[in-house]
């Protein structure tokens, strides 16, 4: 047990070290994660938080859920465009994510790689999975670093784990690493 404490502390520090320091106002957004100077993901921002996002230099907002979700803002496109940011939506069904949806997002990112982008969904589960894939495939971030960042928000369920594995396999990337645990979370009660 005595040897476990330093190991747990080291893992905690290494898991959080890949994420950038965050402006406290942005940290108020549900599960906000800053991966680099130009890329972040989050859950659903409020109307007011979109102003904070714009004030922090974001130039593009990509929404990967449906506008009829409980906390969604049906006029988010107008809010974002009204703040002089680009808006893109790729509706991703949480129970059935498709490769074409990920590649639509990735293609948009690759066209303007330096555009400061917030990728968001409802709670940052879809968005962290897409962020994980994008960072590993296009930004050459290690599987272990990207997985640790994703795990600060959630551990993918079977549908999302299989989706992640499919996209990685399509790109000839092995999902395994020494610190990666792809064990499924316990079923919800």
Where would I find each of the regions flagged by the language model?
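Universal eukaryotic N-terminal targeting presequences
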Residues: 1-2, 18
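Hydrophobic h-region of N-terminal signal peptides that target proteins for export
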Residues: 8-17
């Amino acid at each position: 047990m005595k040897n476990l404490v330093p190991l747990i502390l080291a893992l905690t520090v290494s898991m959080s070290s890949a994420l950038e320091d965050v402006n406290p106002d942005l940290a108020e957004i549900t599960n906000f994660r800053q991966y680099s100077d130009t890329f972040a993901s989050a859950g659903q921002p409020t109307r007011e938080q979109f102003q904070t996002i714009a004030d922090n230099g974001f130039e593009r907002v990509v929404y990967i859920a449906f506008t009829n979700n409980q906390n969604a803002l049906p006029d988010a496109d107008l809010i974002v465009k009204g703040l002089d940011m680009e808006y893109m939506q790729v509706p991703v069904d949480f129970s059935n994510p498709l490769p074409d949806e990920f590649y639509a997002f990735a293609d948009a990112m690759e066209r303007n790689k330096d555009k400061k982008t917030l990728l968001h969904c409802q709670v940052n589960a879809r968005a962290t999975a897409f962020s994980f894939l994008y960072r590993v495939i296009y930004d050459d971030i290690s599987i272990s670093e990207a997985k640790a960042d994703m795990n600060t928000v959630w551990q993918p369920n079977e549908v999302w784990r299989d989706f992640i594995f499919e996209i990685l396999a399509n790109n000839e990337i092995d999902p395994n690493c020494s610190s990666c645990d792809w064990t499924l979370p316990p079923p919800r009660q």
